[in-house]
Amino acid sequence: MITTRARLALAAGASARWASRVTGRGAGAMIGGLVAMTLDRSVLRQLAAGRRTVVVTGTNGKSTTTRMTAAALGTLGAVATNAEGANMDAGLVAALAADRHAKLAALEVDEMHVPHVSDAVEPAAIVLLNLSRDQLDRVGEITVIERTLRAGLARHRQAVVVANCDDVLMTSAAYDSSRVVWVAAGGSWSNDSVSCPRSGEVIVREHGHWYSTGADFKRPCPQWWFDDHTLYGPDGLALPMRLALPGAVNRGNAAQAVAAAVALGADPRKAVAAVCTVDEVAGRYRTVRTGAHEARILLAKNPAGWQEALSMVDKHAAGVVIAVNGQVPDGEDLSWLWDVRFEHFAETFKTTPVVAAGERGTDLAVRLGYAGVEHTLVHDTVAAIASCPPGRVEVVANYTAFLQLQRALARHG
């Protein structure tokens, strides 16, 4: 039951959201949520009451996995979700307020917000994807995040924790939970988990397995896993899974989404069919016609995300554009460029035009040069696409470069 004060707070938030839209200042979800929370701090708890909620968190893949989880849960009924990725408290309030009658919710939540958000929404399931470096000026060391998540999970023993057992840090966060579903969702980026988060000793990796040399801490046996075309689950379950989205990383995201939905009672076959329909996530992965080119846009925000995005680039594309900005939301320190393995481009894309673009295109060009990647430099991303031969162009962009490109393409029609 929502109190009178909360109703007034939500009405004020709706007015703020409307004002933001009509004045052209944005969709207004954040300002609407902020206004509502300012007037009633308990509004998130009240909006979540009576719902079965899945919280999705991790450094990379939150938006995609949340979208897939919402699709899978949709086989059970109406689902409230923050589809645009506003993953802090105000965005969650806006998402739940927008669909007050849905009895299910799939919420993307920023890693550091998970403990207090879980206290408010009492999730039925919590999905733990991966942890790696991402804007250290904002969230601090990833070991701190792991300990914060671990402490938060300890307060919610009733929640099913769907954890990626290939990620050392997320495994540690979930290790002590009483209701864990382990998913082998993949973990190709291991640079940020070379030591055990529990003992500080070395993590040894061999043949897809890992273990700590200093504690009784090792990769759990997964209940869900996948290969190129099949999702495997408990009791001999094997279901064909052909996603609309590219890459092994998205098959891992889908596996965790299905596992979470099944934990809430979804039929596995229907859940898999639902995640296979997801073909775009807030503009990511979509293909846009611009002049003589079809540009597919991939988003990457940190070294691990870049490594995954680069692995999805079509080898047969007419051109590849890599766009990098260095604004505050991106992280102004671009030293991480040297952690991304661009070297494989030198061989894989030997005859394909590669264009460095974005506000920090010069920094990127230096990195590509050291990696031995033949390239040109065109700072404007739309112009960079136009400089490629006609046909399909793969565009990989970091956060603000991605947003700028979306706006520019919208203006170009």
Regions found by a protein language model. Name each.
Residues 5, 179-304:
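Adenine nucleotide phosphate-binding catalytic loops in nucleotide-utilizing enzymes
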Residues 381-413:
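A glycine-rich beta-strand to alpha-helix segment
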Residues 108, 129, 162, 253, ...:
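Residue-level signal for inorganic ion chemistry
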Residues 103-105, 157-161, 293-295, 348-355, ...:
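Short active-site oxyanion
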Residues 281, 293, 299-377, 412-413:
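Active-site beta-alpha connecting loops in nucleotide-dependent enzymes
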Residues 136-144, 331-335, 405-407:
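Glycine/threonine-rich flexible loop motifs
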Residues 4-182, 189, 195:
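Phosphate-binding loop of NTP-binding sites
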Residues 114, 168-172, 329-332, 360-366, ...:
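Short, charged/polar "capping" segments at the starts of alpha-helices
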